[in-house]
Amino acid sequence: DKNSYRAFRNLKDEFDNWDEVAGQSRIKIEKQIKIAGLGKQKSGAIKNFLFSVKKEKGKVSLNYLKNFSNDEILTELTKYDGVGVKTASCVLLFSLKRNICPVDTHVHRTLNRIGIVNTRTPDKTFLAIKDKIPEGIAHSFHTNLIRLGREICKPAKPNCSVCPLLKVCNYDNKNLNNSIKSKENSFMLLDNV
């Protein structure tokens, strides 16, 4: 997500390290991340997490997690207020380079529509798929599903006629109206899946 990345870059550009961020006020953190939305809520969670890790481990670092299993890391990270399954799974994928596919609303919706899962919440979708992603593809699987969900498999009026997964999709309410304008879907990296 562009805005999340920009918020991350703002923090990295403004402060020298995560220990410095931990010492900042929630308002200063919020100023740097507001572009990503929910600035007050997220800044509080970030401050709480960084402060707690620094207090418990002596410095802000995720290195202590490297020898933990994925499930142990999920348990460890979600014990902090404001850190849910999605955030913890993003840490696993993006920071610790684990083969984990975080599940947001787009991933949840597309996997349910296609018929890969039959779950009611993103967290339940995550639990259903977390150990089933073939090694080495979680990152591309995650990013392609997000893009598919944003650009084609939208919540209302999905553009099913251009979907590369149309033939395998189990969604009952397919919208095959060709009049919907769509961006070219050459972004799909499904050959890797």
Could you tell me what each predicted segment is?
Residues 1-185, 189-190:
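Catalytic cores of DNA base-excision repair glycosylases
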Residues 193:
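Acidic, metal-coordinating catalytic segment for phosphate/diphosphate chemistry
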